């Protein structure tokens, strides 16, 4: 079922370059309430509950969740689709109940559900009764139906927040939703440096690569570095020219790569512009306006 994070894999906000606005939001809305429940209790605000991280694929939602657990000094437990869904009637619901029970026994704990849209798909769109039953059980667990979720911070990630059942976003469930945008320029430069660590390279300016990769996800940046490696290896194998990765290789790779976030951003733009989306997506709208995508 839920998998506990091994200590060597734990990272904190100090390990994440850039994204200062996002880190500030996460600290104020998620981490501080968890670390200082007494202060928030004075205002009838309690730690725990659920937070939905959403945004384009490959932009570090899982990394942010891991960092939150580290900053909260809490156990990190991650749950994937295969940990829950089962073909036999009732087994998926039992798996969910067991996962929440395990988290309560590990408190303080951050319980992270990846690809939540697959586990909590909108019941109005679902054609399967099994899907609806899983969502019902998920809602019951979030409500702490007959149990206690205090000191259990529930995080979830999705690339498709519009497919998540609306009931999941009501108060006390995943009522807090945090937009995780594509990495900013500082973060992109850091990713380039990180992916080149231990790899022969020379004269690389990560800042220039970052400037040429607007809207690229972290996964896109990794793809650029991998493509640059291919260029160098091709020279090794076909021309017997041994050399490190250079700036020209990375710029060529960046030019040959398209940002995979653009399709997501177009979908989000249409949702904000034409579908009459509520304030849930105001952060997305602000991002689109800031980057002149609307």
What is each stretch, according to the model?
Residues 6-212, 216:
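Walker A/P-loop NTP-binding motif of AAA+ ATPase domains
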């Amino acid at each position: 079922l839920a998998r506990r994070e091994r200590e060597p894999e734990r990272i904190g906000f100090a390990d994440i370059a850039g994204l200062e606005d996002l880190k500030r939001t996460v600290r104020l809305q998620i981490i501080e309430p968890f670390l200082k429940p007494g202060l928030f209790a004075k205002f009838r605000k309690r730690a725990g509950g659920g937070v939905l991280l959403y945004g384009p694929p490959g932009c570090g939602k899982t990394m942010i969740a891991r960092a939150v657990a580290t900053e909260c000094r809490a156990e990190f437990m991650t749950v994937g689709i295969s940990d829950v869904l089962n073909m036999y009637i009732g087994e998926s619901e039992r798996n969910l109940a067991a996962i929440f029970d395990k988290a309560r026994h590990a408190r303080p704990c951050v319980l992270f559900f990846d690809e939540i849209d697959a586990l909590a798909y909108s019941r109005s769109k679902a054609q399967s009764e099994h899907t609806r039953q899983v969502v019902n059980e998920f809602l019951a667990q979030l409500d702490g139906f007959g149990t206690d979720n205090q000191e259990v911070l529930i995080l979830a990630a999705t690339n498709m927040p519009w497919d998540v059942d609306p009931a999941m976003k009501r108060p006390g469930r995943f009522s807090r939703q945090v937009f995780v945008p594509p990495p900013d320029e500082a973060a992109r430069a850091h990713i380039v440096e990180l992916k080149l660590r231990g790899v022969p390279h020379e004269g690389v300016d990560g800042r220039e690569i970052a400037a040429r990769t607007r809207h690229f996800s972290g996964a896109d940046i990794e793809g650029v570095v991998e493509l640059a490696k291919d260029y160098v290896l091709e020279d090794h194998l076909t021309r017997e020219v041994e050399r490190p990765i250079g700036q020209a290789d990375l710029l060529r790779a960046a030019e040959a790569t398209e940002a995979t976030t653009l399709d997501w951003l177009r979908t989000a733009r249409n949702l904000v512009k034409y579908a009459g989306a509520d304030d849930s997506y105001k952060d997305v709208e602000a991002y689109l306006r800031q980057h002149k995508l609307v």
